[in-house]
Amino acid sequence: FACLIWNPVLVAVAIAIIATQQHALIVLCHDSTHYRLFNPRWLNDLVGRTCGMVVGVSMCTYRIVHRLHHNHLYQDQDPDIPLHGGYPRGRMYLAKKLFRDFCGLSAWKTYAYFFGAPSTNTESSVQSSPPLDDTSKRLQYSAREDRWLVAGFHVTALFLAFAAGYGLQYLLLWVLPLATVVPALLRLRALCEHGAVNDITSPLRAARTNFSPRWLQWILFPHNVNYHLEHHVYPAIPHYKLPDCHREMVKLDAFEKAEIRTVQETFGL
């Protein structure tokens, strides 16, 4: 509808809404890296790879990269440190980073990450070793195959969109949100999950669970991804069981001094 009348405000709203749903697909792809979308692994991987493919993410590659984040949290091998490391850095620093995200200047880094490119810890200037080397030959093969499928899908989609006369709409309403809004959402969520935590050596204080109004939950924390502390303690629990996990841990008084905050507290608002 936004493209039919080409109203700039409606187009901007459409881009923002589509980006939130693209982000939600990445969250489902994340769950599949843990083999937690469906019990049959073939179905888990089929759905996870499909969710990732349409948003430029190689799920099989992300599976390898994301394991390093769990196994080496806050260490030089953690591929997520460029997003969440070194905070607090001040609001102006974050504003500059988000400006770059919204301008599409960090898109190549975002999707290079999902394709297994080594990351650099900006705090220590240490470049991690190639993350895809740290796994089995079978997973390496699956990741390589998946990357070709993702790349092929997007080349084909672009060709078909232009052939059908919808090339501009495809670029504006699918590629542009992926290149601008999605990297910003990923950065903000990473900061909520791990930015400026109290104790990187404690399982209950190195990751953070964030509570927010329902509208913000829909934008920034789809599929219960706000329960990040619980996810790091129990990564085998699927996303739809994380609220139950939180309630059980509350009953057991397991959250003493744990990183559980509102989003306003996380950002010091």
Label every PLM stretch briefly.
Residues 1-20, 28, 53-172, 239-269:
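Non-catalytic, topology-defining segments of multipass membrane proteins
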Residues 25-34, 62-74, 189-196, 221-237:
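Histidine-centered catalytic micro-motifs
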Residues 6-9, 32-40, 118, 191-199:
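Membrane-interface elements of multi-pass transporters and channels
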Residues 19-29, 58, 98, 106-110, ...:
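Transmembrane alpha-helical segments that form the membrane-embedded catalytic/substrate-channel core
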Residues 37-56, 78-92, 96, 201-216:
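Juxtamembrane helix-capping/reentrant segments at transmembrane boundaries
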Residues 197-201, 233-234, 244, 250-252:
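Polar-ligand-bearing catalytic/cofactor-coordination segments
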Residues 123, 127-138, 204-227:
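Active-site-proximal inter-transmembrane loops
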